[in-house]
Regions:
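A residue-level detector for the "anchor" residue at the start of short, highly conserved motifs
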Residues: 3-217
């Protein structure tokens, strides 16, 4: 049992910290990490809400466990990303190297290999494993936003967290527009809007901290 509990919440931008075992953790915007100031000898247990990337120090005697509200991810030493925002229906775990397992009381333990991503949906309690390009899911920790056929609704959800803004769509059809691209997270938000608006028949209007998304026609 640890002597104290650390609690880090990042409202905007990104935050990097080192844990007592040498593990490094990166937190994305609107994310919270709770962790022991000093880990116990037999396990290293933390709790994540939001999105985090972890480079775990190897220790075969003490598994590293990430608790989320949908289950646990267990590792010994590896690099992986966990996205588990409470307002989203799916938790996503993406493995860069090593091995991780996902544990939930409703489904059998699922083990990931490098380059695989596990998706677990809140509603139907089903887990899916798929092969992915991990760069698309971990670029945020290097200040890159990488989108591949991503809906405008999901893109704006990410930007809203990063820039701490509200988003209002004129109609639901605009939410389903798809975009691909690679942008720096510290780009001025109006530059994002200009790039997205090119050839997409969509217009962005920024008023205070609210973005109104409308058809350009």
């Amino acid at each position: 049992v640890s002597r104290g509990l650390g609690d880090v919440y990042k409202r905007q931008g990104m935050y990097c910290l080192s844990l007592s075992d040498g593990t490094r953790a990166w937190l994305n915007a609107d994310s919270r990490l709770k962790y022991p100031v000093v880990f116990a000898e037999n396990e290293r247990r933390i709790r994540l809400s939001g999105e985090g990337y972890f480079k775990v120090a190897k220790d075969t005697q003490a598994p590293f466990i990430v608790e989320t509200d949908l289950g646990e991810i267990r590792v010994m030493g590896t690099e992986f990303n966990v996205k588990c925002y409470p307002d989203e229906t799916i938790i996503a775990t993406t493995l860069v190297n090593g091995k991780v397992s996902f544990i939930n009381s409703e489904v059998p333990e699922r083990i990931l290999a490098p380059g695989q991503q596990l998706l677990f949906e809140r509603g139907n309690q089903e887990a899916e494993i798929r092969q992915v390009n991990v760069c698309n899911y971990i670029g945020w920790k290097d200040n890159q936003l990488i989108f591949h056929k991503e809906t405008l609704e999901e893109i704006m959800r990410i930007l809203a967290r990063w820039y701490d803004i509200e988003v209002v769509f004129e109609n639901n059809d605009l939410k389903q527009l798809e975009f691909s691209g690679n942008l720096n997270k510290y780009t001025d938000i109006e530059t994002f809007f200009r790039l997205f608006g090119i050839g997409a028949n969509v217009r962005f209007q920024l008023s205070g901290r609210t973005v109104y998304i409308k058809s350009a026609e």
